[in-house]
Amino acid sequence: MMVFWIGLNILVTEALRTLLGTDVPAWAVLLASSGPLYVVAMPLSMLAFTRVPVIRTRQYPMKAGEFIQIFVMCIPVMFLGNMIGNILSAGATDGQATNRINDVILGSDWRVNALFIGLLAPVCEEWIFRKEIISRLRRYGEKTAIIFSALAFALFHMNVFQFFYAFGLGLMFGYVYTRTSRLRYSVAMHMLINLNGSVLAPLVIQQIDPRILDGTVSEAEIMRMAEAGNMGDMGIMMLYGTVMLGLCIAGIVLLITKRKSWEFYLAPEELPAGLKIRTAYANPGVIAYLLLTVMLTGWMLFA
């Protein structure tokens, strides 16, 4: 899947540059990346998946309160992972690395972001990394399947900035899918998080004077703006930040208080502890995937 996706991505991107020169619109960049992935690479991956049988499980509904609680738990997981990714990226490159995904998001129309990042990506990614992977690996152990799914999901992004929060969220989404066997819940959580990061947050940032964000406005000028009542847009950002901080704190509290309520059940073909890593990861296909994605992650960081 990765080879087809990357190869087609390069071909489509080069074709766009040939036609449009260096002035390639952001929506075209997203299309060049997402189109080959969703239309060609992911369907082709089924050729490999179908070789491993799916274990049939009962489906369980998730109550609204349970959904909200787990979604709120995702917020601190996301923030912590994002901090780790930013710190490691900056440390490895002496602060020279840039998050290309953020650049694409900020340079795109919010409707394009909503379609490709907020809607299509969660559906396709949850289908592959939760439904197809966990449904086939859970026979060997629920924790093994969830961790494998989360790691594959994180490496799939090929971005140190995103790796840690994608891994953390992958664990959360994997647990939700394992307990319910219904894709709708993890897809909905994934959509909410992506819509926040690709639509809501950029719209909030765009309301702020860029000089305030980059620190080129003096304190005296900020005071004059406040006295003149011109800080309304800043108030929106402060409100957004306050809400996210509140959700983050609530999520931490829930993660602590609910830590003993996570349920995992013995699988029909549960692997012994000493064989789990060897069986799940020490095979040619997984090794090739790990090597390819790790190399591309490093290349994306230093390129």
Language model regions located:
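Alpha-helical transmembrane segments of polytopic integral membrane proteins
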Residues: 8-9, 13, 41-46, 77, ...
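Juxtamembrane helix-loop-helix connectors linking adjacent transmembrane helices
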Residues: 19-28, 54-127, 135, 298-303
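Generic hydrophobic, helix-prone segments enriched in Leu/Val/Ile
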Residues: 1-2, 28-32, 53-54, 71, ...
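Membrane-helix interface linkers and caps
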Residues: 14-22, 26-72, 96, 249-273
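Transmembrane helix-loop-helix hairpins at the membrane interface
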Residues: 111-302
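Alpha-helical transmembrane segments
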Residues: 1-9, 69-78, 285-294
